[in-house]
Amino acid sequence: MDSWFILVLFGSGLIHVSANNATTVSPSLGTTRLIKTSTTELAKEENKTSNSTSSVISLSVAPTFSPNLTLEPTYVTTVNSSHSDNGTRRAASTESGGTTISPNGSWLIENQFTDAITEPWEGNSSTAATTPETFPPADETPIIAVMVALSSLLVIVFIIIVLYMLRFKKYKQAGSHSNSFRLSNGRTEDVEPQSVPLLARSPSTNRKYPPLPVDKLEEEINRRMADDNKLFREEFNALPACPIQATCEAASKEENKEKNRYVNILPFLSLAVSKDAVKALNKTTPLLERRFIGKSNSRGCLSDDHSRVHLTPVEGVPDSDYINASFINGYQEKNKFIAAQGPKEETVNDFWRMIWEQNTATIVMVTNLKERKECKCAQYWPDQGCWTYGNVRVSVEDVTVLVDYTVRKFCIQQVGDVTNRKPQRLITQFHFTSWPDFGVPFTPIGMLKFLKKVKACNPQYAGAIVVHCSAGVGRTGTFVVIDAMLDMMHSERKVDVYGFVSRIRAQRCQMVQTDMQYVFIYQALLEHYLYGDTELEVTSLETHLQKIYNKIPGTSNNGLEEEFKKLTSIKIQNDKMRTGNLPANMKKNRVLQIIPYEFNRVIIPVKRGEENTDYVNASFIDGYRQKDSYIASQGPLLHTIEDFWRMIWEWKSCSIVMLTELEERGQEKCAQYWPSDGLVSYGDITVELKKEEECESYTVRDLLVTNTRENKSRQIRQFHFHGWPEVGIPSDGKGMINIIAAVQKQQQQSGNHPITVHCSAGAGRTGTFCALSTVLERVKAEGILDVFQTVKSLRLQRPHMVQTLEQYEFCYKVVQEYIDAFSDYANFK
C-alpha cells in the first residue's frame, strides 16, 4: 500500500506542475489544453446565434490497452457540424488556463480556437479517426510540459495495473484453482459459491476470549447475559465463520450438487489456511489436538488433513466417493465425530455406506423429520422389519420412546457377495426429539441426559460417532461442543467454548450456527457444573439415602436439605406469566403465587362474544415417555368449574387425580365439580355420576361427561386420594404407589391423553404425584432414578412444584418402598 501511495503522490505532483505551466500562456490558435472530460461526450456544444456555419475539431488522446498491456495513445478527431441558414455551431467558449475534470477521469487533448472558424462540413455531426491538423506555430513550452505530465501518468497507470495483475495471480494460486467461498455467522442462506477464491476472514475483533475456570462460569455467564445477551452476541460474532480457505471442489461438481441439502454447507476437500491463522489456532489448541491438525507448508496449507469423509468409489459411477460429511475432532480425540447433513432421499444409500465403511456404531440425530411442515431429513430407516439401502440391509430390532429422545437399535449387514459376506453389526440411533422448531430447548437437562446416554452406549473401539441435524452444522455443532467441553471441564477444570468452536469451524464451516445455540452451550455447562450427575442406580439408593442424611461439614444442613435448597434457589420467572396476571384473570387464581407460565399454560377455546375466556390455572407437564403427560391444575373455584370441565373436554383428558379434600382445617380447598347423585350442567358441559367405588386409600368415580353443543359423550374416571393428611405427608408410600398404578392402568385402556392432577393450589401435592409417577416409571423401565432432576424439571414448568422439604423427602421414601416391596427388585441388581 505504501508503494501505491508514493506512485499516486508522484503522479499528482507532475500533473500539478504541468497545470501551472499551462496557465501561464494565453490561449491561441496553436495552444493545446489539458482537460478531463467524459468518454461519452468529447466536446461540449453551445448554441449561439450566428449567420454562418462552423465546425469544431476536438483532438482527443486516450490510452488504449492491448491484451499484452502495451500502452499506445489513439488520436481521435471529433467533428461536430451543423448546417443551417440562420445559425452556426461554435466551439465551446475558451477558458484561460486550469484543468477541467470530468466524472470518469479520461484525459483528453483538445485544440482551442479563439476566433478562427474552419470550412463548413456537409451533413450532420460525425466522428472520424484522423491525423491531427497542422496549425500555425506557437509557443511549444506548455505543450511539452503537458506531454511530459501525460507520459508520467501513463507510466504510473501501467505500473499499477502490473502490480494488480501480479497480486491477483498470487491469490489465484493460493486458491488451488478451485471454487472457494466463505460463509458468515448466523442462519443458513442458500448462496452460490464464488468462482474466485477469497482469503479467510479474520475475526471481526481483536478481543480475546480465553478459557474460563469452572468456578468463574456462573459469574461470567450472568455478566454476558446482561442487557439481552449483549456480550454473548459480541463473542459469537467475533468467531471466525471459517478460519480457513474452504476448498470444496468435490462438493461443487455438477454430479454432486444434488447430494447437498444446502448449497453453502459443504465439506472441505482439504484445508488451506494462512500462517497467521495456523499460529492463532496453535495458541488455543491443546498439544494433543495440535498434532492432529498438522503443520503448514510454505503456502500455508495443512497438507496432511482432509476433513471430508471419502466413500469407497463404486466402479463405473463417477464421483461416488462423495458425501456431505466432515470429520470433527473431539476434546482430545482425532476424528471422534462425523458431522453430516441429514440424508436426502437420493443420498440415503450413501449414508448407510458411510456408516458401514467407517465402522460407526452410534448415530446421533438432532432434528425431526419435518419441522414447520418442511422436510429436514429423509427417514433413512424402516419403521419395522427390514429394508435394503444400496448394499446395506437394515433391520429394526428395538425402539424405545422417551420424553426427550427415542432410541432405535438396528442390525445392519452388507449384501451382494455371498461368499465374502461380512458379519452383522448392531447400530444404535439416538434421536433427540425435544429441539423446538425455533430457538433452543428451554432447559439443557434433556440434552445432558441424552449426551450421557450416547457416551455410555458407544462401544470403546467403534468408529466415529455420526452426528447429523438437517444441515449438519448448527445443532450438530452444539452437541459436539457440549461433549468436548464436558470432557475439558473434567480434565482441566476449565472450558474454552470460543477456542473450540473456532477450531471445529476449520473442519466444517458454521459449526454452532446461532448465538442462541452458543448461549445454550454455556447453559448446559453451567447446569452440569452446578448440579452434577444426580442419576442413581436403584441398587445404590439405600446407600445414597444414608449419605444425604449426614451433616455436611461446615454447614448446619444435611445432604438432603442442601439438595432441596438448590431447588428452591431456582428463579421463578414472574415476567412469563402474562395471561394469568391480567386483571380479568386474577380472580380465577386460587393462590396468586402459583400462576402458569405462558409457554406451557393450558389454553381453552374462547367463548363466543366473551373476552379473556381462554384462561384456566393449569400447566402442561412432561412425563417420562412423552411430553404433556399431565395437566397440573389448581382445584376449581366455584366460578371456574365450567372452565375446568371445558379444559377436560378440549384436551380429551380421561383421568382426573384429586389429592385434596373439599375442605381442610375449616378452609375450602376445592369446589365440588361433580354431582353427588344424578347429573349437573356447567354451560355446555353436563356431568353425570355413573358409579362410585371406595378403595383402600382412594375413591374411584366414573363420570359421563356430555358436550351438549357437540352432542358427544365421554367416560371420565376420577381418582380421589384420601391418604394425604391436612398437615404434613402420608405416613407411608403404599397408598401413593397403589393410586399411581391404578391411574396408569386406566391410561392404557383409555389412551394416552393428559392426566389431570390437582390438589388445592396445584403445586405441592400435585408436583409430588407427578414426580413420583415419572420416577417410578423410569425405575421400572431402566432401573435408574433421578429425583433431583425430576423435581427440578417440574419446577421449571410450574412454580413451587413439590413445595416443601417433607414432600421432597417423601419422593425418596416412596421409591425406596417400591423397590423393597416388589419382586422385580431382583432384576435391578
UniProtKB/Swiss-Prot annotation:
Lineage per the UniProt record: Eukaryota, Metazoa, Chordata, Craniata, Vertebrata
Subunit: Part of a complex comprised of PTPRA, BCAR1, BCAR3 (via SH2 domain), and SRC. Within the complex, interacts (when phosphorylated on Tyr-825) with BCAR3 (via SH2 domain). Interacts with GRB2.
UniProt GO molecular function: protein tyrosine phosphatase activity
Protein family (similarity comment): Belongs to the protein-tyrosine phosphatase family. Receptor class 4 subfamily.
Protein localization: Cell membrane; Cell junction, Focal adhesion
Positions where Phosphoserine occurs in the chain: S202, S204
Protein name, per record: Receptor-type tyrosine-protein phosphatase alpha
Keyword Amino-acid biosynthesis: no
SMART domains: PTPc, PTPc_motif
Gene: Ptpra
Extracellular-side positions: 20-142
Active site per database record: C469, C759
Signal peptide: 1-19
